């Protein structure tokens, strides 16, 4: 089924980062394909990633009311069929901002538990990796991170999940390579959107 409405979440402290440019390329390509996009820039939204007792899951109470921020952000997800998450891979994981979003918003009684689930049919993760692909694969990180993200989605009832790794996003060997390599990264995410 072709995606019609994407919820695009991204996390990077700098609005002019490569992560921001990749998120923008995804947004633009989706619009070219007549896909509606709602974008959540966690940093510019001033999202608070810190879990508080108010938002801590209550395993005995599926009807728990969480903070207004959590319910507002969860309600934004409801009218979308596809989630795209863009983030830099720091220490082989999410930035704390994105982890906090997942912990707080994809909460028990909302995104999972007792028949609850995220409203998406598809999730696409786009991870920006600083190092080279060969080392990333050889050390097992590509498989480990892919398995982790896909299994998280499976736990939430979403089987159509995939990960795009954009490697070599920190080190470039000169301006010419930089420009052409940047275009190749954009091409990868455009292809990802086209396949939605």
Curated annotation (Swiss-Prot):
Keyword Oxidoreductase: yes
Top-rank lineage group of the source organism: Bacteria
SUPFAM superfamilies given in the database record: Flavoproteins (SSF52218)
Keyword Oxidoreductase part of the UniProt annotation: yes
E.C. code: 1.6.99.-
Entry's family note: Belongs to the NAD(P)H dehydrogenase (quinone) family.
Name of the featured protein: Uncharacterized NAD(P)H oxidoreductase YcaK
Lineage of the species this protein comes from: Bacteria, Pseudomonadati, Pseudomonadota, Gammaproteobacteria, Enterobacterales
